[in-house]
Amino acid sequence: MIELITVVTIVAILAAIATPYFRDFILGQRIRAAGYEIVSALIYARSEAIKRNSGVTVAAATGGWQNGWTVTSGAITLSQHEALQGLTMTGPVAGLVYNGNGRLAATISPFGISAANSSAPQRCINVDLSGLPSSQAGSC
């Protein structure tokens, strides 16, 4: 009986120690997934701009990038993305526009993704003038 109590106590102590780190691990995975989601949307927008030979816009939803974003070509909505629950995302205020050749119409500020009250690593998504996005760990 004493052995069982000892094992249960050790398991409880280990669980208490591991829980905060597990939370940060989960948040880190959510941040990474959100980064890949915006990179995927940017690659899609670029390919649509080339395919249509016309401008394609990626813009934040009302209230900012963490509330989602849309990919449009003129008045046609090509794609809509949901809000990022529990994450903060910053990006170019005016959105970004891909020209028909797949290049950006202007330089933009990078996208930043983080979680409040967490030590999980932030994610930074840069888009070069050729229109290709890249994702890396760390702040922008």
Residue ranges and their predicted role:
Residues 13-51, 55-140:
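N-terminal helix-rich module
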Residues 1-12:
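Glycine-centered recognition micro-motifs in short, flexible terminal segments and loops
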